[in-house]
Amino acid sequence: ANALLGGTDAVLIFDESGFAKKGEASAGVARQWNGRLGKVDNCQVGVFATLCRGDMATLIDARLYLPEDWCNDDERCKKAAIPEDKRLFQSKTQLALAMLKIARQRGIQFGYVGIDGGYGKEPAVLRGGDKQGYRFVADVHCDQTIYLQDPEPLVPEWSGRGRQPSHRKPQSAPQRVDQWA
């Protein structure tokens, strides 16, 4: 894949897909959002990494999303033949970040990462990728709020009344994407 599609003009795209299911025995099946159907339904969800350049693309990694209820049910996991080391809950964004790290370790070359609004709304994805030195093209929801500069969250000074503050708060106000753009 890297020899044919890798390079600084390539993009590594992350997305998920739902697979409708009737029963409850398939690994990871649950009532959850199925983007292919456009509704919450009984399904499995996979997170996929695709390397693209021009009009060519290939799948380079895929992970089954295992809902937290599944991870906490050893008997159900055994029946579905899920190995013990795979029963640790990871959000879809955590799966995508893990695949991003593995792609780089494998030497996959790409100029930037593309993600849809489901991942673009997650600060952990953008921060995690930014810390690793990646450039992103991220779809975001129009009502998502953003900071144009680091909000420098701090614990506010105690006013002398009520409980003493313990949670950090941003020092600047966020803006909605549709009002900024």
Ranges and model annotations:
Residues 75-181:
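An internal, acidic/charged active-site-proximal segment
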Residues 1-68, 78-79:
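Active-site-proximal, Lys/Arg-enriched surface segment
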